[in-house]
Regions:
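Fungal secretory targeting signals
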Residues: 1-23
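Short, surface-exposed loop/turn segments at secondary-structure junctions
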Residues: 85-88, 110-116, 139
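Acidic/histidine metal-binding catalytic segments
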Residues: 87-91, 137-151
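His-Asp-centered metal-binding catalytic motifs of divalent-metal-dependent phosphohydrolases/nucleases
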Residues: 92-111, 125, 129, 151-156
């Protein structure tokens, strides 16, 4: 999940459960099978179906996480459906899997395979998503895997995305649609309404606050130097003060440099 913002990119089988009517098609980029979820047409490949099944595991302990992941995917898909040129430019399967799995590192279940002791949750999520694709017959090349990984790991650093590929950008952009606030003109109001009706966002902030606090509590080695520091210092006894790794490194290095090179000349331009 991300808190920064960045500029938007450019602009039959029988009925099953309500709001999910599958449509048959080929498997090339232009003819992927689709279905409807919350009245939003989405890609429906076996890999995407497996990703949806995976995130449903979060419902018992973290229903807000499941809803967040589904909304992120569906908001992006709704924007694509509203812009044929954009939709044709995006790898829809990559987008689906990347958005659905972008917060695997939030998994609070004991012995979660996506909760390392020393990596940021974005990295755990990206590595977990790559492993998922490989283990579930995705048969993606390394470039495709990297685009998904980058979109997941950069989700909290939207300002770093300039010049990145459209697929990485749209994983992040789709997550940005997720937060309550002004609605994006890229998504129809009717689509917002159907998505929020099926996957409500009424606990997204409380759930996020709890998850970030839990991350600081359970893996401080993976949260130091990230924005999770704020939650650790605010809510976790004994976490310690907020880290200033880069600042401490540079300022400490200045003193050492002067001591080691007393005769060197440096002219400040400030």
């Amino acid at each position: 999940m991300k808190f920064s913002s960045f500029a938007s990119c450019l602009a039959a089988a029988g009925a099953v459960a309500a709001g999910r009517v599958p449509h048959q098609g080929g498997h090339d980029k232009g003819q992927l099978p689709t279905t409807k979820i919350a009245n939003i047409e989405v890609v429906d490949t076996p890999l995407v179906q497996s990703a949806v099944k995976l995130v449903k595991q979060f419902i018992p302990l973290q229903p807000y996480l499941y809803n967040h992941l589904m909304r992120s995917w569906l908001f992006g898909a709704a924007a694509f459906n509203n812009n044929a040129t954009l939709k044709a430019s995006v790898d829809l399967e990559l987008h689906a899997v990347g958005t659905l799995l972008h917060d695997l590192g939030w998994d609070m279940r004991p012995n979660s395979p996506w909760h390392s002791a020393n990596r940021p949750f974005e990295v755990d999520s990206g590595l977990g998503a790559v492993a998922f694709v490989k283990e579930n017959g995705g048969n993606w090349d390394e470039n495709r895997l990297e685009r998904m990984y980058d979109g997941i790991t950069l989700q909290g650093m939207g300002s770093y995305l300039a010049g990145k590929n459209i697929d990485s950008n749209w994983i992040v952009q789709s997550v940005e649609f997720e937060f309550p606030g002004p609605r994006s003109p890229l998504i129809r109001n009717a689509d917002y309404d159907t998505i929020l009706a099926e996957f409500p966002n009424d606990t997204v902030f409380r759930g996020t606050n709890e998850t970030f606090t839990w991350l600081a509590l359970t893996k401080p080695a993976g949260t130091r130097g990230t924005f999770i520091d704020y939650f650790g210092t605010a809510y976790v006894p004994g976490y310690g003060p907020q880290s200033h790794v880069a600042f401490d490194l540079i300022t400490g290095g200045v003193a050492d440099e002067i001591a080691q090179h007393p005769n060197s000349t440096f002219v400040s331009n400030l």
